[in-house]
């Protein structure tokens, strides 16, 4: 007899719970809203394991390569902390510590025999968003109808990371459909922010944001079609890289709307530092992914591009544009302060900072919103209805059910509109450079209109999604935290739209006190090396080279 969707979900939750050994179970869950420091006082991790999980990925791979740490030691530490993270934040879809430790033992045996690492990530545990396929495990994408189907092979990126020496131990939670910036589905429920359980961890790579935020992971792999790497990074006070399409391999990953080629989802890392973002990116590019994924551009890591930024920083400074309002939705006071703080730090260090006028972001936001629903939402609704489960309420914030499926001629016209908009934006970029008499190195902007938002209150995607439409490289840099004593409600606010009013009405200085605040550093398309270097400079000036 077919099982109901509720029974299928309950079975999955029961199977997931059994993957946590009894000795790693939290006996009494903390009552406090913030659980960010709970792993340190849980008694589950030893002092040595705490030290490992508090270290950077760059430091860990250095010690693993030198034989100062074994992969089993490092993997066990992160498995234990990930188990705690799962119990506190509900951040996992799959957890497989036994397989991870077996993989770690194989790597240790290789090192003992050959006296060298297998690759740049030798022995390092890396957490994977549920989209990445790992042979033998489920990829549900937050759909109940996808449960009980086991992957017969790895995604290309999974293969690349495995070749580089990474260890896999967890696949993290995503929202139903992937198409929202809140992580909730009918299988496991809601994933929460470890800094405050009343705040969203972001989405769709929300499980990655939560697990890396609480240091149950050191490098997390996410994806981004409308902010899904950058928003979880921002909400968890982390760094996140949204590379341009074609830089890192996406082949053989699961996705909603597969075959949609107008705006591409991209894959990238979430970490505690730019150094670790760079480690991940260089390690993957070192595996020559263009030989495995036909959409990847044959472009190895270009150190010369990083060096150009280093030279500019040393000799006269960078030329940075900035904006704090896209003309559609005004950010909350903490975000406005975050942009102001970043701009002031850059100016104080001698960099040139100039206001940037966002170009037709209302058009860009409207266009990409129509692209998301170009099939009339048929793809996602098919996978939702297949099990009889209801759609999560958040879907209506991004996928408009009133938009009808487009025909081929309308699709071609959409492609042309996107291309024209991209070229118009490049023209504005060039005009700014001609006016300044030098390159515009990057633009500083909000990534969301809110600090880490309260559950089910994420309304506006435009600060993130327009960058997807333009396919610019973007790096999220954590700035500060909301402060009720500084970030007072804007009493003179006048809305430019109903959505603008709705977002601003959500702001409560008390409720948002302590919420992470971030900005994004936006570079030209395929400018990963330069944009990472600029983000590193920004993080250094803000005192956030490595986040806690």
UniProtKB/Swiss-Prot annotation:
One of the GO biological process terms: regulation of amide catabolic process
Keywords in alphabetical order: Hydrolase
Induction behaviour: Acetate induction mediated by facB regulatory gene and probably by amdA regulatory gene. Omega amino acid induction is dependent on amdR regulatory gene.
Annotated catalytic residues: 129 (charge relay system), 204 (charge relay system), 228 (acyl-ester intermediate)
Record family assignment: Belongs to the amidase family.
Physiological role: Allows acetamide to be used as a sole carbon or nitrogen source.
Annotated protein name in UniProt: Acetamidase
Species whose genome carries this gene: Emericella nidulans (strain FGSC A4 / ATCC 38163 / CBS 112.46 / NRRL 194 / M139)
Source lineage: Eukaryota, Fungi, Dikarya, Ascomycota, Pezizomycotina
Record gene name: amdS
């Amino acid at each position: 007899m077919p099982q109901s969707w509720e029974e299928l979900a309950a079975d999955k939750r029961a199977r997931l719970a059994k993957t946590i050994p009894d000795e790693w179970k939290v006996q009494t869950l903390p009552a406090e809203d913030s659980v960010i420091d709970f792993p340190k006082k849980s008694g589950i991790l030893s002092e040595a394991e705490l030290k490992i999980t508090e270290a950077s990925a760059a430091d860990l791979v250095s010690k693993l390569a030198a034989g100062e740490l074994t992969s089993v030691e490092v993997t066990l530490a992160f498995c234990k902390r990930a188990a705690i993270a799962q119990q506190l934040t509900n951040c996992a879809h799959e957890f497989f510590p036994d397989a991870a430790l077996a993989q770690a033992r194989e790597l240790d045996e290789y090192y003992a025999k050959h006296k060298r690492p297998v690759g740049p990530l030798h022995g390092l545990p890396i957490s994977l968003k549920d989209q990445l396929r790992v042979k033998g495990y489920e990829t549900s994408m937050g759909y109940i109808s996808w449960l009980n189907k086991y992957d017969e092979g790895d995604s290309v990126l999974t293969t690349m990371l495995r070749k580089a020496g990474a260890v896999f131990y967890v696949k993290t939670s995503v929202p139903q459909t992937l198409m929202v910036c809140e992580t909730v589905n009918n299988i496991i429920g809601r994933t929460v922010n470890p800094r405050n359980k009343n705040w969203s961890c972001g989405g769709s790579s929300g499980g990655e944001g939560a697990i890396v935020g609480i240091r149950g992971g050191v490098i997390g792999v996410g994806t981004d079609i409308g902010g899904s790497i950058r928003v979880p990074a921002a909400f968890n006070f982390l760094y996140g890289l949204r590379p341009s399409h074609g830089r890192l391999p996406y082949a053989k990953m699961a996705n909603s709307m597969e075959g949609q080629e107008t705006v591409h989802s991209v894959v990238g890392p979430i970490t505690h530092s730019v150094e670790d973002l760079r480690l991940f990116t260089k390690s993957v590019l070192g595996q020559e992914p263009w030989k495995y994924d036909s959409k990847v551009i044959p472009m190895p890591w270009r150190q010369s591009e990083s060096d150009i930024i280093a030279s500019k920083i040393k000799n006269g400074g960078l030329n940075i544009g900035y904006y704090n309002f896209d003309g559609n939705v005004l950010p909350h006071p903490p975000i406005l302060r975050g942009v102001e703080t970043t701009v002031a730090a850059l100016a104080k260090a001698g960099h040139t900072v100039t206001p940037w006028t966002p170009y037709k972001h209302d058009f860009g936001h409207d266009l990409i919103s129509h692209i998301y629903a170009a099939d009339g939402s048929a793809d996602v609704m098919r996978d939702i209805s297949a099990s009889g489960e209801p759609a999560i309420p958040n879907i209506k914030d991004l996928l408009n059910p009133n938009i009808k499926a487009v025909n081929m001629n309308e699709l071609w016209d959409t492609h042309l509109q996107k291309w024209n908009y991209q070229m118009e934006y490049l023209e504005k970029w060039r005009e700014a450079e001609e006016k300044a008499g030098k390159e515009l190195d990057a633009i500083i902007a909000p990534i969301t209109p809110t600090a880490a938002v309260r559950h089910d209150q994420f309304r506006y995607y435009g600060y993130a999604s327009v960058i997807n439409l333009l396919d610019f490289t973007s790096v999220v840099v954590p700035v500060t935290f909301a402060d009720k004593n500084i970030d007072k409600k804007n009493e003179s606010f006048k809305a430019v739209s109903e959505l603008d009013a709705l977002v601003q009405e959500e702001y409560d200085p008390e409720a948002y006190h302590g919420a992470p605040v971030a900005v994004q550093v936006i570079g030209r398309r395929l400018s990963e090396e330069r944009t990472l270097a600029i983000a590193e400079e920004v993080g250094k000036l803000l005192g956030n080279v490595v986040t806690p």
